[in-house]
A protein has these predicted regions:
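Carbohydrate transferase catalytic cores enriched for Leloir-type hexosyltransferases
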Residues: 1-367
Length: 367
């Protein structure tokens, strides 16, 4: 029996949730997650649907759910027994999250590390402490770990994980539509919460420079992402722009409208200082939209030759000049669009699922 641990899946839309919805449907294994009543359930793969779980009705379980501690509120051995299964039948446990099932340390487990951002660009001391003091236990319990980039793999090694236990499996994407053939205007899009690692001040510096030195820019930068620790700073920077009306702060958009905004934008921007992968950049490339991104290791790892890079901590002049070049030079826009689309074609979800399946199969054979 193979178990897929989904106890850390939170309600609503998130990057982690999107990862589950892309990957888990292609994997064999009984799904372990919270049911409508806030209790653990085991769902056969043929009966499972990739819908986010609800918030648990009880206050205690909802608290555990919020902090990815659900396993500590469940009697997992009893749940296994009530479903007619024995611990000895568990061949392997796979988690698309950075969580092992700590009650079963003797069962081979494969867990996924998407990033270690809380250790280097944390938004709270609580998150830093959780990663520094609690995540090492999950790493020790896991038999193997998936890192979604070589950058994350290197971070895991620095975190104390044996490099022989790490497998790098990058995110994949499905190309569902023909790429955009030409820019529809000069609008820009950034998908970023108001968190420290998203480095939104760099975008405001770039737009400020663009407005001052290229006043004919007629577009709008839309920053889509929920508020966070940096919201007061973001609001101050917004108001201080020469033309604040050219930047819109949007908490969220329905999926269809977000896609429409992306495809109608001249480019997607990402100024992050710390990421495990930065999936929105790949999403933009799958639509044929050029990307202008910060010069950080994980961006270089995947996007060298198919994106334009700007410093994360300069005065904004490089980003501004790149945007001017993109507006003026249609051939540059076309080059970035085509090279980005080619990168997206090379990173498929099917290949990602196949690599994960190999790792799960290897665990099953070792038990």
């Amino acid at each position: 029996m193979r178990l897929i641990n989904l106890l850390s899946w939170l309600p609503g839309h998130s990057g982690f949730g999107s990862y589950v919805q892309r990957v888990v449907p292609g994997l064999d294994g009984t799904r372990l997650q919270l049911g409508l009543d806030g209790q653990g359930v085991l769902v056969p793969s043929g009966q499972w649907t990739p819908d986010p779980p609800p918030w648990a009705p009880g206050r205690r379980m909802r608290f555990l759910q919020r902090y990815s501690l659900v396993q500590h509120g469940l009697d997992l051995p009893a749940l296994l027994h009530s479903n007619g299964a024995k611990l000895s039948q568990l061949e392997a446990i796979y988690s698309p999250f950075f969580d092992a099932l700590l009650c079963w340390p003797d069962v081979p487990q494969l867990i996924t590390c998407h990033d270690l951002t809380p250790l280097v660009a944390s938004n709270s001391r609580k998150a830093w402490l959780r990663y520094r003091l609690w995540q090492p236990r999950h790493c020790r319990t896991a038999t193997r770990l998936i890192a979604i980039s070589r950058y994350v793999a290197d971070q895991l090694v620095a975190f104390g994980v044996d490099p022989m236990c790490i497998e790098v499996i990058p995110n994949g994407i499905r190309i569902e539509r023909p790429g955009v053939q030409s820019p529809q205007g000069e609008d820009l899009l950034a998908l970023a919460r108001h968190d420290v690692n998203k480095n939104l001040p760099a975008l405001f510096r770039g737009i400020s420079q663009l407005q001052r030195h290229w006043p004919q820019w007629s577009g709008i930068l839309r920053i889509v992402g929920r508020s966070g620790r940096q919201t007061p700073l973001v609001q101050r920077l917004h108001k201080s722009l020469p033309r604040p009306e050219q930047v819109e702060l949007v908490d969220s958009l329905p999926r269809d409208l977000l896609l429409a905004r992306l495809r109608s934008s001249m480019a997607l921007l990402s100024a992050s200082t710390e990421e495990g992968f930065d999936y929105p950049v790949l999403e933009a490339k799958a639509e044929g939209i050029p990307t202008l991104i910060s010069d950080i290791p994980v961006h270089r790892e995947f996007h060298q030759g198919s994106s334009m890079f700007f410093p994360a901590h300069d005065d904004g002049s490089v980003l501004a000049s790149q945007l001017q070049a993109l507006i003026r030079d249609r051939s540059l826009w076309t080059h970035l669009s085509c090279s980005g689309l080619n990168l997206a074609r090379s990173l498929t979800v099917d290949a990602q699922i196949a690599e994960i399946s190999v790792q799960i199969n290897n665990l099953s054979k070792s038990c």
